[in-house]
Amino acid sequence: MSRRRGKVEPRKITPDPVYNDVQVAKFINCLMLSGKKSVAEQLFYDALEIIQKKTGNDPYTTFREALENAKPQVEVKSRRVGGVTYQVPVEVRPERRLALGIRWLIRYSRDRNEKGMAAKLAAEFIEAQKGTGSAIKKKEDIRKMAEANKAFSHYRW
């Protein structure tokens, strides 16, 4: 069912103060728990400092590449046709692509074994930049599932 009053305008997110980047601000907002934004900001910037110490590379570039590598191109959606549920591969919209990439990086960072959230984030960013890590594995699993169900792509809506 469509909306009566047209499209909803997306909220404007103010860029973060250090890198002046909206994607960094979104990442910090998703990292935040219980409204504690200053804690989330500190964790994020500490993680970037850890990346600087470990690799010697530009931490901001590492973050951007890690996020880009974690973004999925395709995903599968369930579609019920005649009593049978098919997993239909669909292309992911750019906004959702960013949201999923951020969500997966944070989720799999929290599951890691390093001491402290900043160290966990840093390790996940470094691995995601290299093309390894749990967030990248999740992306690849979904891509493989979409590839396996390519035969049902004509059921798109």
UniProtKB/Swiss-Prot annotation:
Tell whether rRNA-binding is among the UniProt keywords: yes
> Cross-referenced SUPFAM superfamilies, in alphabetical order?
Ribosomal protein S7 (SSF47973)
Query: What GO biological process terms are annotated to this protein in UniProt?
Result: ribosomal small subunit assembly; translation
CDD domains in UniProt: uS7_Bacteria
Q: Which GO terms describe its cellular component?
A: cytosolic small ribosomal subunit; ribosome
User: What's the domain of life for this entry?
Assistant: Bacteria
Ordered alphabetically, the record's keywords are: Ribonucleoprotein, Ribosomal protein, RNA-binding, rRNA-binding, tRNA-binding
Do you know which NCBIfam families this protein is assigned to? rpsG_bact
Q: What does the protein in this record do?
A: One of the primary rRNA binding proteins, it binds directly to 16S rRNA where it nucleates assembly of the head domain of the 30S subunit. Is located at the subunit interface close to the decoding center, probably blocks exit of the E-site tRNA.
Give the family, as the similarity comment puts it. Answer: Belongs to the universal ribosomal protein uS7 family.
User: What binding partners and quaternary form does the record give?
Assistant: Part of the 30S ribosomal subunit. Contacts proteins S9 and S11.
The protein here is known as Small ribosomal subunit protein uS7
Q: Which organism is it from?
A: Leptospira interrogans serogroup Icterohaemorrhagiae serovar Lai (strain 56601)
